[in-house]
Regions:
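Secondary-structure transition/hinge residues
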Residues: 16-19, 35, 66, 109-113
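Conserved SAM/SAH cofactor-binding pocket of Class I
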Residues: 96-143
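Secondary-structure boundary/capping signal
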Residues: 19, 23, 38-39, 70, ...
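A general structural signal for well-ordered alpha-helical segments in protein cores
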Residues: 8, 27-28, 58, 71, ...
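Conserved AdoMet
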Residues: 29-107
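Non-catalytic accessory regions of SAM-dependent methyltransferases
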Residues: 1-43, 48-50
Length: 143
């Protein structure tokens, strides 16, 4: 792995062989994280060399992803409702298909004078945190 382009090709092939359905995309996200870049910045400069530290981080991420760890756990974070949340195996990964529910709660809470929101079965807390960020005056409890 001398440059980013070669690293991505090798990683995508390894992930495909491991049964990863989004092999190329996952490789891009992991390499961007390893290099401390946005995915867009990475893609705009694929000919750049990898430092030894970047290559080591990328290799560690790749091993975990090839072993079946979810990408969000490998990266240690995920996006939900426009916010970044830390993420690991202690809680379920906040999912994009939960965002419409969260948006409905925010809309409903915004229409109330003194809203109270209770999230039962909170895992990561991403729903409650997102509601509180959107409705700072709401009393939000996660249990």
């Amino acid at each position: 792995m001398n440059d980013r382009c070669s690293a991505l090709k090798d990683a995508a092939a390894r992930l495909e062989a491991a049964g990863c359905s989004d092999a190329r995309l996952d490789a891009e996200w992991m390499l961007a994280e390893a290099a401390g870049l946005s995915r867009l910045s990475l893609l705009l400069d694929l000919d750049a060399p990898l430092s030894d530290q970047e290559a080591a981080r990328f290799s560690a991420y790749l091993a975990r992803r090839a072993a079946g760890d979810p990408l969000q756990y490998v990266l240690g974070h995920t996006d939900f409702m426009g916010h970044e949340f830390r993420c690991d195996a202690r809680a379920l990964i906040p999912r994009g298909d939960t965002e419409p529910l969260c948006e409905a709660v925010i809309e409903r809470a915004g229409a109330l004078k003194t809203p109270s929101v209770l999230e039962l079965g909170a895992g990561s807390g991403a729903v409650s945190v997102s509601v509180k960020l959107a409705c700072p005056g709401a009393a939000v409890t996660a249990a």
